Amino acid sequence: MYGVIERIEPQKTDMHRFLELVKLMEEKKASDLHLRVPSSPVLRVDGILQLVQDIPPITATDMELLLESIVTQEQMDNFNASPELDFAYDISELARLRVSAMRQRGTISLCFRRIPKDIPSIESLGLPPICKTAILKPRGLILVTGPTGSGKSTTVAAMIDYLNENMARNVITIEDPIEYLYSNKKCLIAQRDLGYDTESFDTALVHALRHDPDVIVVGEMRDVNTISTAIRAAETGHLVISTLHTVDVAQTIDRIIDVFSPDQQQQIRLQLSQVIEAVISQTLLPRIDGGRVGAFEVMIANPAVRSLIRDKKAFELPNIMQVNSNIGMQTLDSALSKLVASGIVSQEEAMMKSSNPEHLKRLLEY
């Protein structure tokens, strides 16, 4: 089931052992650390789960003590009242982690996601060029989508950091929790942590509009109120960037429309068609030579795109992306075929990520 990592000394104290695990995460560039009773620790490295050997199975007491040592009393009270908790945790110069705590079978389960201290550049992530041009736009809505763990937060952070280096803008982020930490360069940036600095995305978004923002980052558009307010913010002359757990461009447009009641949907289609600037849908694949690489579906708003959204024809967007590759649009299958043709990923891995394997197969044969 798992790969194996031999490393940690079993006799260490609980907190010392945890810090050693975090160091191991950094060394292996693991994306996640899983601690769950009654298993030994498990790291996810390049998308593969790997068991850390030489540590005895974690006990319920171990987990209680560890959680109590890394949360505030208020956070612990919240967890006891509602046994799910998400927060960020800094370990001085060692690491910054996004932590998710829950109970399973009566015991605490923890997942730690590693957040790199330095924000990666757009170039280093291999992001499409639209990430640079879109983030410099004065207004509109930019969406970064993909499944959990596909790097959406990192893409958004790279875009905001590029803006921070190139333009003077007032930026307000609303995150759950705050992941990457920005320092002011050319931009003035405020970061609000859901549950600590604000009660909800919707409330924070409404109040952000009163703070003279140029750019608003909404960590995730989770509900109808947040989506509606984000669209209105884009309509009133702000640049809004957010994320959704959708796998491609057409599904993204449909998901936004479908959260509204039927009597509202045509109006939302009209509004969305007017404010949307770009949708970047991404997924991660294992590289043949080790590590992972992103594949990106890219839609850039133009008159044809806006017309299809307005006329309830999101299913035709892939056709528009295919014929407008000269301006930077591309379908996911096109991105996957390029990765296979370049020898970066295997055909088998690409097929598993494609929503239309037969179409991808034809592209590869062509």
Question: Model-derived features: where do they sit?
Answer:
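Short, flexible helix-loop junctions that flank or precede catalytic/ligand sites
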Residues: 2-366
